[in-house]
Amino acid sequence: MFLTLIAAIISFMVSAFTMPYFIKFYQLKKIGGQQMHEDVKQHLAKAGTPTMGGTVFLLVATAVSLLVSLFSIKNTQSLALISGILSIVVIYGIIGFLDDFLKIFKQINEGLTAKQKLALQLAGGLMFYFLHVSPSGISSINVFGYQLSLGIFYLFFVLFWVVGFSNAVNLTDGIDGLASISVVISLVTYGVIAYVQGQFDVLLLIGTMIGALLGFFCFNHKPAKVFMGDVGSLALGAMLAAISIALRQEWTLLIIGIVYVLETSSVMLQVSYFKYTKKKYGEGRRIFRMTPFHHHLELGGLSGKGKKWSEWQVDAFLWGVGSLASLLVLAILYVF
């Protein structure tokens, strides 16, 4: 526990110290920044804000985790577990980096196409499964203490879980500070679970990422001076999925990650309903003012018809939802 605390502090300090230099480099080179939705007018002023800040906190968290692990953990099984989780973080970080690079440096608006991104994510998920999950012999899901055996179909579950939550966190990263603190809340919860289980290797990894993310948040809160980009959000979502698998608490991510589930569900519902109503009535209709869900809140509160919410109000609401959901999971696991 003490080692985790030290690693978290080091990650925070290095991340917070390095980020201003990253921002300054971005500005000096006059690199194109984040593009904004025209429908949310209060976001237009953010156009050009440096992005790809996830590169910094991912490098910091990965480096600190590896260094501390190599010097303090002698158990080869623990090292393999840490390297397994870090591998999926790095792979998805590279995918996100490539997507951001194409958007910003090559001026390709959509970056990777949806098919290209999905293909790379599936390839990364397959590597994670065959190199780190399959050798462990895991083929079942822990659902409220009951082991649901999936056999070979566990492969498809892992792919769905990792790809799904990486994209879900990516959708959540739409306003200042929302994704970074939402992920911190999720990681703190998994940190408690790892501590109770005695999985201090996973706890170390969680602690370093929390520290690095908090260092990043110093510059990502409203008004944000930097965004994490796909390089950060895709990697963080994959990390949460991998941790839930490593701790054998896969089901908990549906509740701990309720914010990401809400954001993704809102997009899926909106698109499906729009297509259905367009086919039936000749014109597309919407359930939400705008998706993902945080934009709906910005444009008119919960009902979508009330006063506009500030980014701080949206952040506070969704952070609160995530915190309550996380407490519910801990209560289910250790109280009831």
UniProtKB/Swiss-Prot annotation:
Keyword Repeat among record annotations: no
Membrane topology: Multi-pass membrane protein
Family: Belongs to the glycosyltransferase 4 family. MraY subfamily.
Keywords from the UniProt entry: Cell cycle, Cell division, Cell membrane, Cell shape, Cell wall biogenesis/degradation, Magnesium, Membrane, Metal-binding, Peptidoglycan synthesis, Transferase, Transmembrane, Transmembrane helix
Major site of localization recorded for this protein: membrane
Gene, per the UniProt record: mraY
Record-given protein name: Phospho-N-acetylmuramoyl-pentapeptide-transferase
Physiological role: Catalyzes the initial step of the lipid cycle reactions in the biosynthesis of the cell wall peptidoglycan: transfers peptidoglycan precursor phospho-MurNAc-pentapeptide from UDP-MurNAc-pentapeptide onto the lipid carrier undecaprenyl phosphate, yielding undecaprenyl-pyrophosphoryl-MurNAc-pentapeptide, known as lipid I.
Molecular function per GO: metal ion binding; phospho-N-acetylmuramoyl-pentapeptide-transferase activity
PANTHER family: PHOSPHO-N-ACETYLMURAMOYL-PENTAPEPTIDE-TRANSFERASE, PHOSPHO-N-ACETYLMURAMOYL-PENTAPEPTIDE-TRANSFERASE HOMOLOG
Segments traversing the membrane: 3-23, 53-73, 78-98, 118-138, 143-163, 174-194, 200-220, 226-246, 251-271, 316-336
Keyword presence, GTP-binding: no
Cofactor: Mg(2+)
UniProt pathway: Cell wall biogenesis; peptidoglycan biosynthesis
Enzyme Commission numbers on file: 2.7.8.13
HAMAP family referenced in this protein's UniProt entry, alphabetically: MraY
UniProt subcellular location: Cell membrane
Catalysis performed (reactions): UDP-N-acetyl-alpha-D-muramoyl-L-alanyl-gamma-D-glutamyl-L-lysyl-D-alanyl-D-alanine + di-trans,octa-cis-undecaprenyl phosphate = Mur2Ac(oyl-L-Ala-gamma-D-Glu-L-Lys-D-Ala-D-Ala)-di-trans,octa-cis-undecaprenyl diphosphate + UMP
Biological source species: Streptococcus pyogenes serotype M4 (strain MGAS10750)
Biological classification of the source: Bacteria, Bacillati, Bacillota, Bacilli, Lactobacillales
Pfam families found in the cross-reference section: Glycos_transf_4, MraY_sig1
An example Gene Ontology CC term for this record: plasma membrane
PROSITE patterns cross-referenced by the UniProt entry: MRAY_2
GO term, biological process aspect, one: regulation of cell shape
